[in-house]
Amino acid sequence: MGHAPDTTLGRLYKEHIRLILAKDIDALLDQYTQDALLISSFSADRKPVYFRGRDQLREHFQGILGLKNLEVDIAFWAESENPTTLMIVEAVKVVDNKGESSTMRFADSWVLKDGKIAIHFAGMVQYPDGSLA
């Protein structure tokens, strides 16, 4: 396992994580196109939730920005050009505002347009209770 490579997408990803930890939602949203689509499986019923545009993305990120700590270990990294696309699997450890820690696995995929994230699939692969998606 490891870290993001020193590529354009690797640097964008590192900045993405840095902005989450810094709780800088405006700068985080600036990484996305105005009409971006984020599909998330971070829901209590484990059904997909669709966030379109920056106002809805802001809603999604409010929950993530409430984390006290976030550690990411990349298990899989793949990127391509034309279109610029990223696919990663991450082992994630978080500490929430109550001080409770959780370990999960995510699968994230980005499709970029003009250097910004246009489509983001944020999928939970392994939930905090250890169950698989």
Where are these regions (language model features)?
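Short beta-strand edge/turn micro-motifs at domain boundaries
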Residues: 103-133
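Short, low-complexity N-terminal intrinsically disordered segments enriched in polar/charged residues
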Residues: 1-30, 34-35, 132-133
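A short hydrophobic beta-strand element
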Residues: 82-92
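Short solvent-exposed loop/turn micro-motifs enriched in small/polar/acidic residues
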Residues: 11, 70-71, 101-104
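Hydrophobic/aromatic beta-strand elements that line small-molecule binding cavities or substrate pockets
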Residues: 74-78, 91-93, 105-111
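Short beta-strand segments enriched in hydrophobic/aromatic residues
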Residues: 32-33, 90-94, 123-124
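Short, cysteine-centered beta-strand-loop-beta hairpins and adjacent loop/turn segments enriched
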Residues: 67, 93-103
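A solvent-exposed, acidic/Ser-Thr-rich amphipathic alpha-helical stretch
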Residues: 6, 25-84
